[in-house]
Regions:
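Hydrophobic residues within beta-strands of alpha/beta enzymes
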Residues: 33, 69, 100-102
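Conserved catalytic cysteine-centered active-site region
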Residues: 64-72
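Flexible, glycine-rich active-site loops centered on histidine and acidic residues
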Residues: 3-16, 78-102
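Glycine-rich "substrate-gating" loop/helix at the edge of Rossmann-like oxidoreductase active sites
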Residues: 45-47, 74-79
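N-terminal beta1-alpha1-beta2 module of alpha/beta enzyme domains
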Residues: 1-63
Length: 102
């Protein structure tokens, strides 16, 4: 059975939180870590910060070695398909290939 984790990253998840979470996932039986790709809180909380989804995934790819990473969706309303493709390919190269889910 695949065990994966999804986090609503736009709800004030800091880089330190992402890093600790990815390390904990990689040390456990969790195969993949997914995050939402939203710029604003879906809970209507404007004060909540949000790191960019693909920048976060690329950074996590650099500090993990087995954890699969990705988003559930990436809205084309603010991510042009060619820019999204470039972001995903970049993350895949940083990950060493084969760990990025789209």
């Amino acid at each position: 059975m695949r065990v994966c984790l999804m986090i609503e990253g736009q709800e004030s998840v800091s880089w330190e939180d992402w890093l600790a979470l990815a390390k904990a996932c990689e040390a456990s039986e969790i195969e993949a870590l997914f995050r939402s790709d939203h710029y604003l809180s879906v809970m209507g909380r404007a004060e909540r910060s949000s790191l960019d989804a693909w920048a976060t995934i690329s950074a996590l790819a650099a500090v993990t070695s087995t954890l699969r990473l990705g988003t559930l969706v990436s809205p084309v309303t603010f991510r042009h398909p060619s820019v999204l493709a470039k972001n995903v390919v970049t993350a895949d190269h940083i990950a060493g290939g084969g760990r990025i889910e789209l």
